[in-house]
C-alpha cells in the first residue's frame, strides 16, 4: 500500500494512524466520525455496532442524505470522501490536504492514502461531502 509522508510528525493525523479496524465499532465510518468529532467539532452518528456491512452501507447513504451534508466538487480538509464498489457506497474517509484520505481498512487500520491510490485498492471515489458548518467556513 502506498503511504507517503505528506504531513509532519506533529500533524493532527498522526494521532489516528495505526488505529485498528474493529468489526462493528471501529470500521471506516466509526473512525471517520471520531475524527470529525475530535478534530472538526461536529457529531456524525456512526453505524449501529453489529458489523453488518449492508446496514453500514445503508447508514452511510442515509447520513449523506441529511441536510447537514452538501456535496462539493473540490474537497477541503475534513470533508467526507465517499467511495463505492459497483453501485453501492462501501467506504468513507476524511480528506486531508494535499490530496490524501485518512481512512480505516480491514487490513491496515487507519491509514493516510494518496487519493490516486484509492482506486487501485478497490475504492472508487463517489464524491466529496462537506458538513454544513464547514460549508460556511469555506465560503
What are the language-model segments listed below?
Residues 1-17, 115-139:
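Non-catalytic ligand/cofactor/substrate-binding and regulatory segments of enzyme domains
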Residues 16, 39, 91:
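Short glycine/serine/threonine-biased micro-segments
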Residues 19-20, 66:
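Conserved short-loop catalytic and cofactor-binding motifs
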Residues 20-40:
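Active-site nucleophilic cysteine motif
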Residues 35-40, 55-63, 116, 125-131:
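Short amphipathic alpha-helical patches
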Residues 42-43, 47:
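A structural boundary/capping signal
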Residues 48-110, 116:
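...with weaker cross-activation on analogous glycine-rich loops/strands in unrelated enzymes
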Amino acid at each position: 500500500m502506498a503511504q507517503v509522508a505528506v504531513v509532519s510528525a506533529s500533524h493532527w493525523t498522526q494521532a489516528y494512524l495505526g488505529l485498528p479496524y474493529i468489526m462493528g465499532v471501529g470500521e471506516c465510518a466509526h473512525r471517520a466520525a471520531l475524527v470529525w468529532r475530535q478534530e472538526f467539532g461536529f457529531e456524525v452518528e456512526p453505524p449501529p455496532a453489529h458489523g453488518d456491512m449492508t446496514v453500514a452501507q445503508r447508514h452511510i447513504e442515509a447520513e449523506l442524505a441529511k441536510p447537514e451534508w452538501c456535496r462539493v466538487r473540490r474537497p477541503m480538509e475534513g470533508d467526507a470522501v465517499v467511495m463505492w464498489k459497483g453501485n453501492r457506497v462501501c467506504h468513507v474517509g476524511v480528506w486531508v490536504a494535499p490530496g490524501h484520505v485518512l481512512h480505516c481498512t480491514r487490513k491496515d487500520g487507519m491509514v493516510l492514502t494518496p487519493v490516486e491510490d484509492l482506486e487501485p485498492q478497490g475504492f472508487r471515489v463517489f464524491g466529496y461531502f462537506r458538513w454544513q458548518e464547514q460549508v460556511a467556513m469555506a465560503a
